[in-house]
């Protein structure tokens, strides 16, 4: 868990040493999708989206691949999953799946090498602000955990058999820092709110669908894209 999806994307790039390269991201997304690569001295190669799904257009991704392309940030737009399977047919590099707007989408977070989620105030499961990184890569996970808290690896159990001063059980004041890290963990208050919001996910989604239906009814005289 991290303090935002933005921090999550940044940490993934730093943990994997992705820098000084080209990173593909879509034209339609929140600005941080394009900004995070710049923080890592990368070029944001912004490619077109499919006019119906509003997700990455695989053909335009293919046209924009370069020898120096080291990552693709594939955004699941408004609950619609990005075409990662299609992109995998011609690209075998790192794909970060941006699940900020797909907390309730079946299969979300399972296609990319790593997924980043958002619990910011306007998302499906808000906790004020916050985010999460998910991956099946154990090596990457082991790097990310201490990176969220200044590279400190000894804070997870502060009460030890030897407190380091008296030789007796007690609170340990020493820190072990094995790597460069950042202060971007999720605080307990955010986590507690998230756990409660999970219980309300169905209700929140039902309300969002009600709002969507109302918009569609009121704007029915305008040109519509096919419903998802």
Regions found by a protein language model. Give the residues of each.
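Structured catalytic cores of enzymes that bind and process phosphorylated ligands/cofactors
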Residues: 38, 47, 75-78, 102-104, ...
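PLP-dependent aminotransferase class I/II
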Residues: 59, 71-75, 80, 84, ...
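Conserved active-site segment immediately N-terminal to the catalytic lysine
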Residues: 94-127, 132, 142, 172-177
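Basic phosphate/pyrophosphate-binding loop/patch that engages nucleotide-derived ligands
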Residues: 65, 88-94, 127, 132-153
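PLP-dependent aminotransferase-like
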Residues: 14-99, 103
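Buried hydrophobic packing segments
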Residues: 8-16, 131, 194
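Conserved N-terminal alpha-helix of the aminotransferase class I/II PLP-enzyme fold
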Residues: 1-7, 11, 164-166
């Amino acid at each position: 868990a991290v303090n935002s999806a933005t921090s999550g994307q940044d940490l993934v790039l730093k943990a994997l040493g992705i820098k000084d390269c080209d990173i593909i991201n879509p034209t339609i997304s929140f600005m941080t999708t394009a900004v995070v690569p710049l923080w890592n001295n990368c070029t944001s190669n912004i490619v077109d989206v499919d006019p119906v799904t509003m997700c990455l257009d695989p053909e335009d991704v293919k046209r924009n691949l370069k020898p120096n392309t080291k990552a693709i940030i594939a955004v699941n737009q408004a609950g619609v999953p990005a075409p990662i399977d299609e992109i995998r047919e011609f690209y075998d590099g790192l794909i970060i799946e941006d699940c900020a707007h797909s907390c309730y989408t079946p299969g979300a977070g399972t296609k990319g090498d790593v997924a980043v989620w958002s619990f910011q105030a306007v998302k499906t499961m808000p906790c004020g602000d916050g985010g999460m990184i998910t991956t099946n890569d154990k090596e990457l996970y082991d790097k990310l955990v201490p990176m969220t808290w200044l590279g400190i690896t000894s804070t997870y159990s502060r009460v030890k058999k030897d407190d380091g001063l008296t030789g007796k059980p007690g609170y340990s004041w020493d820190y072990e820092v094995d790597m460069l890290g950042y202060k971007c963990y999720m605080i307990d208050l955010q986590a507690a709110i998230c756990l409660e919001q999970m219980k309300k996910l169905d209700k929140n989604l039902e309300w969002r669908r009600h709002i969507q239906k109302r918009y569609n009814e009121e704007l029915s005289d305008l040109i519509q894209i096919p419903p998802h």
